[in-house]
């Protein structure tokens, strides 16, 4: 992947940053692509760094992801809840599966989506092979994960658990407006221009 470089003029001359490092200076973290352990470690490190730098300022987490590994996503979510800084979440493009959990786990009142964003909620996906007992263990783990994720959705959206169970039975795509009505986000951002 080609990462753009930004040149910044300072009193000491020019300084080149990769775009993600420059955004980090403004307390912006980009979560894009599949959520896995490597991505989670990077996002967690950035959250911890920004919180240690100044825990009175918000951190903006921009999300464009098809989802990914549940344990990796939950590690990011736990860190978002652990740090003192408020974490504002913004869906750009797609916030699917585990990414939708991260979107709705932002600080209440600071969960946003851009107008053409799509949010996908569904039950956890998984597969197993091997001996029957191993398959049963994996199936039980998926059921535990589903219960945990539904509880998170219940707590962050205010929707009844039985509605969430029904709504996540199959892929459930929501527009930004539908995600707002559901309680996954608080507002739809149209533009940042000041009047």
Curated annotation (Swiss-Prot):
Known catalytic reactions: Hydrolysis of proteins to small peptides in the presence of ATP and magnesium. alpha-casein is the usual test substrate. In the absence of ATP, only oligopeptides shorter than five residues are hydrolyzed (such as succinyl-Leu-Tyr-|-NHMec, and Leu-Tyr-Leu-|-Tyr-Trp, in which cleavage of the -Tyr-|-Leu- and -Tyr-|-Trp bonds also occurs)
Key word Hydrolase present: yes
Gene3D superfamilies: 2-enoyl-CoA Hydratase, Chain A, domain 1
Residues at the catalytic site: 97 (nucleophile), 122
A GO term for molecular function: ATP-dependent peptidase activity
GO cellular component, one term: endopeptidase Clp complex
Keywords associated with the record: Cytoplasm, Hydrolase, Protease, Serine protease
CDD domains assigned: S14_ClpP_2
Purpose: Cleaves peptides in various proteins in a process that requires ATP hydrolysis. Has a chymotrypsin-like activity. Plays a major role in the degradation of misfolded proteins.
Name of protein: ATP-dependent Clp protease proteolytic subunit
Annotated source species: Lactobacillus gasseri (strain ATCC 33323 / DSM 20243 / BCRC 14619 / CIP 102991 / JCM 1131 / KCTC 3163 / NCIMB 11718 / NCTC 13722 / AM63)
């Amino acid at each position: 992947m080609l990462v753009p470089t930004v040149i910044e003029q300072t009193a000491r001359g020019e300084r080149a940053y990769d775009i993600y490092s420059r955004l980090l200076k403004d307390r912006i973290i980009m979560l894009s692509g599949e959520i896995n352990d490597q991505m989670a470690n990077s996002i967690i490190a950035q959250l911890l760094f920004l919180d240690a730098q100044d825990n009175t300022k918000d951190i903006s987490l921009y999300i464009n992801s098809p989802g990914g590994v549940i344990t990796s996503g939950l590690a990011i979510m736990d860190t978002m809840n652990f740090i003192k800084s408020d974490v504002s979440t913004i869906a750009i493009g797609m916030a699917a599966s585990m990414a939708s959990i991260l979107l709705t786990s932002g600080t209440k009142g600071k969960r946003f989506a851009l107008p053409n964003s799509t949010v996908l909620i569904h039950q956890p996906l998984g597969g197993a092979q091997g001996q029957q007992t191993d398959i049963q263990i994996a199936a039980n783990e998926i059921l535990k994960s589903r219960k945990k994720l539904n509880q998170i959705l219940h707590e962050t959206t205010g929707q009844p658990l039985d509605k969430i169970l029904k709504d996540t039975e199959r892929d459930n795509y929501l527009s930004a407006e539908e995600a707002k009505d559901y309680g996954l986000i608080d507002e739809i951002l149209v533009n940042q221009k000041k009047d």
